[in-house]
Amino acid sequence: RQMCIRDRYYLHMFAKEQPDLNWENEKLRQKLYEMINWWLDKGLSGFRIDAIINIKKNLDFPDFEPDAEDGLAACYKMVESAEGVGELLEELKNNTFKKYDAFTVGEVFNMKPEELPEFIGENGHFSTIFDFCAQCLSDGEHGWYDAPEIDFDTWRKTILGSQLETEKYGFKAN
């Protein structure tokens, strides 16, 4: 997005009023930890952390193939092609939540199944994560806005399968 005043740009994956933060910046991360710990010092016992998987991006800014008629590519491709989010999440946990034994729920929507133990449970980045398995059933060719019809049996099997897969490590929030 172009900023008229300085002829500079900033990245926002959501609303233009919500610029993405550069988690590669050590000073920024330390300030975030300071703010989180301030709340935990006040007695807050947990955090819901939305869109946390988006903190790591491919800052090489590759030119992705367009995936829409407007000639643009979806911003999630920038997150999918990034590596190293686990290191940032572990640093976040160790500098904040772990010190207070705080309960955390992470919004993690593109995790690979084999990564589940890294994300939840005793040694995971979070206490639990939201379960997006049923939401994935409603993604049509162009995302959630052209969702196909879902029958109850498919939905039930998907939820049950996700919970059975997760029980070895912890649980998922719904």
Language model region names:
Residues 20, 35-36, 141, 152:
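Intrinsically disordered regions, especially transient/low-confidence alpha-helical propensity segments
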Residues 89, 93-174:
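Conserved alpha/beta catalytic core and glycan-binding cleft of carbohydrate-active enzymes
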Residues 7-9, 63, 130:
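Short hydrophobic/aromatic-rich motifs at helix boundaries and adjacent loops
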Residues 8-9, 13-14, 83-84, 140, ...:
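Mixed-charge, polar/low-complexity N-terminal
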Residues 1-5:
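Short, small-residue-biased leader/transition segments that mark boundaries at the very start
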Residues 17, 77, 144-147:
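Residue-level detector of alpha-helix boundaries and kinks
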Residues 23-114:
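Active-site neighborhood of glycoside hydrolase catalytic domains
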Residues 6-24:
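N-terminal small/glycine-rich loop or linker at the start of catalytic domains
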